[in-house]
Swiss-Prot record:
Gene Ontology MF terms: glycosyltransferase activity; hexosyltransferase activity
Lumenal face of the membrane: 27-311
Protein name, per record: Glycosyltransferase 6 domain-containing protein 1
Keyword Glycosyltransferase attached: yes
High-level lineage: Eukaryota, Metazoa, Chordata, Craniata, Vertebrata
Keywords for the protein's UniProt record, in alphabetical order: Glycoprotein, Glycosyltransferase, Membrane, Signal-anchor, Transferase, Transmembrane, Transmembrane helix
Length: 311
């Protein structure tokens, strides 16, 4: 564990250097963002929460003007990234519908790089040619220590963001493979740090949210605190912001291991966003669990989230 601690310290120092170099980029990016009032009107959806206490927009159908956003972002000449992990049996059963639907509905009209993380060689499904889309199939080494899928996912993701993704895209989303796009997932979702509201817990009282309540865990959030419960199926933002999350997640996991406790990926995610407020929240429309009845607040399901045995 001492060796792990030294490695973690060295990694942290290198990562902090990267973050310092990224500060100017992030500051400039935020200054160039289109003013919220130009494209976002929270008054059009009085039936739901549309603005957080820290004034971040919550994106629901009807609150945004995509035409205004399209006009702005097309001038920026931006590239989007979408990362998905498809290992073991997920390769064919879940990846095909994910990619087929994403190629149609994810950021249409923009350059998109799909980063597909697999544990063996993969033949992509046949899809219509789109000159704006490219695919990178990245093989994850099969190592025995990857007993924890999320630990593997964040370790590999962090490595690829540092080595090349941060140079290739302006915005990056990471999504679960057991999802199918049903409507446009467009530029209304872009921001420095993007969090996805949990489809089930959004409609529950905050006192019942399943945060980590053990003080010994790095994911701990005390009773009476917390904003929303965020889903682990989608996270996004500028590459350095996603990289920051992977770093904090890995740091928290190692700390918990050293203290003899463990928590879940989603609870670490919620602790991160509790301390580092997202600049944009996606409504449950962007990751709707198909096992739930659709409430009247959900006008259009953008992405359907399926249990892993339903596809």
């Amino acid at each position: 564990m001492k060796a792990k601690g030294r490695i973690l310290l060295l990694t942290s120092c290198l990562f902090l250097l990267l973050l310092l170099l990224a500060k100017i980029h992030l500051r400039n990016h935020q200054e160039e963002e289109l003013p919220l009032s130009d494209w976002f009107d929270p008054r059009r959806r009085l039936d739901v929460i549309t603005t957080t206490d820290w004034l971040a927009p919550v994106i629901w159908e009807g609150t945004f003007d995509r035409k205004v956003l399209e006009k702005y972002y097309h001038k920026q000449n931006i590239t989007m990234g979408l990362t998905v992990f498809a290992v073991s049996s997920f390769n064919g059963q879940y990846l095909d519908p994910f990619l087929q639907s994403a190629s149609k509905f994810f950021m249409p009209g923009y350059r998109v790089i799909f980063y597909i993380m697999v544990d063996k060689s993969l033949k992509l499904p046949e899809m219509g040619h789109n000159p704006l889309q490219s695919f990178q199939v990245l093989v994850v080494s099969q190592e025995r220590q990857w007993s924890d899928f999320d630990l593997m996912r964040m370790t590999v993701l962090s490595k690829h963001i540092r080595e090349h993704i941060r140079f290739e895209v302006d915005f990056l989303f990471v999504m679960s493979v057991n999802m199918v796009f049903q409507n446009v997932f467009g530029v209304e979702t872009l921001s420095t740090s993007v969090a996805q509201l949990h489809a089930w817990w959004y409609f529950r009282k905050t006192t019942h949210l399943p945060y980590e309540r053990r003080p010994t865990s790095a994911a701990y959030i005390p009773f009476g605190l917390g904003d929303f419960y965020y889903a682990g199926a989608i996270i996004g933002g500028v590459p350095f912001q996603v990289l920051d999350f992977t770093h904090q997640y890995l740091k928290s996991v190692i700390l918990d291991i050293e203290n003899g406790v463990n928590s879940t990926y989603e609870k670490y995610l919620n602790k991160y966003f509790f301390l580092n407020k997202p600049t944009k929240l996606l409504s449950p429309e962007y990751s709707w669990d198909q096992t739930f009845n659709i409430p009247q607040q959900v006008h259009y399901v953008k992405v359907a989230h399926y249990p892993t045995d339903d596809l």
